[in-house]
Regions:
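Short amphipathic alpha-helical segment within the helicase RecA-like ATPase core
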Residues: 1-196
Length: 196
């Protein structure tokens, strides 16, 4: 759940606060939830809220444009929280964050890219008891009427998947990742994606 530095509660945050009998407002007033960019706070099983775990991620000053670097910090915190939840399904509620010289489609695309890229895990063959990423489904709720955001999210996921593919090749041992192996991977990509 995205939280700005403003101490006022509105939108989804107000609904969650009312459902929790004022818990969120108390935590904000005690500055346990600050809203500072990238700051993340974990709360287990908030009374009145139908979620096993909740993470509050700071989005900075309300109604103020932020830099791309700050937005990347927010996306990284959201992605880290989603994976740390160890849940199969995650709901992300974020306010519309305004980034300098960027539109809403770009912000959604970057979030999709971070979520996908952060899910990467390298599995070394032969090593037992390797941790597995259990996250299978992510739903994003955003207060925006802009059209085409699902396409922007999909684009971000595709870029993130490409990044993960590159990481997998880079992490493959040199005795396996030979020129022949790379050529086979390239051929497989061209068979799967006609534009490659």
């Amino acid at each position: 759940i995205g939280v700005s530095e403003a101490k006022t509660l509105d939108g989804d945050l107000k609904v969650i606060n009312e459902a929790s009998n004022g818990t969120i407002k108390k935590l904000i007033s005690r500055e346990e939830i600050t809203g500072k960019i990238g700051n993340s706070v974990y709360l287990p099983a908030i009374s009145g809220v139908n979620a096993e775990k909740s993470y509050f991620v700071g989005t900075g000053k309300k109604n103020k444009k932020i830099s791309e670097v700050d937005y990347f910090k927010i996306c990284q915190s959201i992605s880290s929280a989603a994976l740390a939840s160890k849940s199969a399904s995650v709901k992300i509620i974020i306010p519309e964050v305004s980034v300098e010289n960027r539109d809403t489609s770009w912000t959604v695309e970057v979030l999709g890219r971070h979520l996908e890229a952060s899910s990467y895990q390298y599995f070394f063959k032969g090593k037992k008891n390797q941790p597995k990423n259990v996250l299978k489904k992510v739903e994003i709720f955003m207060d925006s009427k802009k059209a085409g955001l699902s396409g922007a999210l999909k684009k971000g996921q595709i870029i993130g998947a490409g990044s993960n593919f590159s990481k997998e090749l880079a992490n493959t041992p040199a005795n396996i990742c030979t020129p022949t192996h790379l050529a086979n991977q390239a051929r497989a990509l061209s068979r799967t994606f006609s534009a490659v």
